[in-house]
Amino acid sequence: MQTSETVSDTGSTVTLQTSVAGQAAVPTQVVQQVPVQQQVQQVQTVQQVQHVYPAQVQYVEGSDTVYTNGAIRTTTYPYTETQMYSQNTGGNYFDTQGGSAQVTTVVSTHSMVGTGGIQMGVTGGQIISSTGGTYLIGNAMENSGHSVSHTTRASPATIEMAIETLQKSDGLSSHRSSLLNSHLQWLLDNYETAEGVSLPRSTLYNHYLRHCQEHKLDPVNAASFGKLIRSIFMGLRTRRLGTRGNSKYHYYGIRVKPDSPLNRLQEDMQYMAMRQQPMQQKQRYKPMQKVDGVGDGFAGSGQSGASVEQTVIAQSQHHQQFLDASRALPEFAEVEISSLPDGTTFEDIKSLQSLYREHCEAILDVVVNLQFSLIEKLWQTFWRYSPSSPADGSTITESGNLSEIESRLPKSKLILFCKNESIVKWMCNCDHMMYQSLVEILIPDVLRPIPSALTQAVRNFAKSLEGWLSSAMSNIPQRMIQTKVAAVSAFAQTLRRYTSLNHLAQAARAVLQNTSQINQMLNDLNRVDFANVQEQASWVCQCDDSMVQRLETDFKMTLQQQSTLEQWAAWLDNVVTQALKPYEGRPSFPKAARQFLLKWSFYSSMVIRDLTLRSAASFGSFHLIRLLYDEYMFYLVEHRVAQATGESPIAVMGEFGDLNDASPGNMEKDEGSDVESEIEEELDDSVEPPAKREKTELSQAFQVGCMQPSLEGSVQQSLVLNQLHSEHIVTSTQTIRQCSATGNTYTAV
């Protein structure tokens, strides 16, 4: 049964035929207006037009350029030079009008692409445009239609449509609605639609409140904000996710863009992390249940195993774009051994090299796939970890894999190799190369923004490394354990430093982009008495006055130019190059590099102290910049020393890792004759008074004496007594071999 409705429009009558619901839908129709004087010539009748119109009819006033029907948002554009819609192949359909009605032309369109970047596929609708009004007659978008996708920015008409919708529904004032432009554009810049993902409503609203606070905007309430979101991202659904008693409402079908600054916020971990089942319900060491460690410490949502696996894969793929997965493991050197341990052969040496190479490649693959928790199992398998009675009764190592390794290299021979010093050194060098590759994979650029969820996962991974390795090597000789733990400790420390540096870089980036803060920093810096700073620091650092003055001038100039973070990084790199250039190619280069770090830190602390005493308004910004520059200087010096010594940065940092073994030897190596001669030359060239020079020489003798190892047969003795609130008195001129301090008493042995 069919019904008819009549629409009155500026004296014209248009009869609209509607059909019952359930008839087959036809493609969306776009209507173009035809001048009145051509009405009679262009009138054509098509009998099938009665099947075009579904049961829903909506009227829009002529002044309204936008209208809605269900989930469809369609916009009419006033542009004349460009074509609004791209027409695909299809037949033409014409509307039947009354005798005095204005004639319109109907063009079939299967996909509509607007200039604003919104692509829509809809079914069963028609647009009729006339001088008095615009009418949309058609079905709402159902599952049979095409999906809606958004590009980076929406057209102005899309934003106007959302604002007008809110004005009608909530009665917003014109002043308040003018603020919605920035809110809507912020949503489009930071969020995008995607299938199979969700965001907590509270988290998204908290991001919005932070945005309003940073830009000093008046936020709308949560209900109006929800309408804002739905007016921009059409087709969003709401789901209640989480465990019983801890569930929250989520927007399903929306996510944060990968390049959005919101990825660096700490609270993004609540939705960037994979949703997984509670840890106590999982089977230990099941690979796909807990892949990347990102979800450590997060409650699950009770999803099924297939859903968890899909979420894990999607999350892993999202984070892998921030890694450098193309880096391969470098080739290891051959083992150089003079004599084989008893009961071993050269074939066993080759088996050890092959097995350890495969072991390191497996670790690299696990890290590339962000399966951090599996590294513990790899260590346990290689080192034949076999607890007598596991606490949870699970089998930690696979019997098949363990039997294969045991057949290639029995554990008894592995123990013998671990006691050989040549094998220990070879394995340490392999570890340094592997860990350096892992660092470059996880953090290829310390200044590039990294999602906070990935950063936290890396830090949790670094925190667990030493414990995992020590537990897996419980039955291995202590010498090998110390060497391996020292290497993995340097690796963990490097990960912690680089993630902290990255976090500081992103925080400082916002400061360096703020013009008002930069101007305030420059004004406060010009009030600092650098002459007084140099006078106080020169006695400690003994730096060239001209070099310090040049650094001050360059720093102010770079700050005044409002340089970017990358430009500041290039400036700091140039400072390191100029400071260490006199020591290039000399054995004292590592010592000079560390001394430069100390001097840089001392000077910067003096400047910060002056700013503090003056109650500088930009003290917080300077403090943040100082932390970043000190950390980045450490990073640069670390790589310069590694380049000068021909080692990896991990090897440089691991040089002093084993305190029980490395302290005397490394100190003796570091305090070589070249460095001591340089110190003597500096003392001879100085123009200090005799009393001051005598005090310096006494202090130097005391420090050098404390660092010399007590390896000789006879131990020379001297006594340094420190009475309460009295000065130190040296009672003998003999060399102080070893010093130990307890309270205020120093005893020389």
UniProtKB/Swiss-Prot annotation:
Residues 183-258 bind DNA. It is found in: Nucleus. PROSITE patterns: RFX_DBD. GO terms for cellular component: extracellular region; nucleus. GO terms for biological process: cell differentiation; cilium-dependent cell motility; DNA-templated transcription; endocrine pancreas development; epithelial cilium movement involved in determination of left/right asymmetry; regulation of DNA-templated transcription; regulation of insulin secretion. Transcription factor required for ciliogenesis and islet cell differentiation during endocrine pancreas development. This is Transcription factor RFX3.
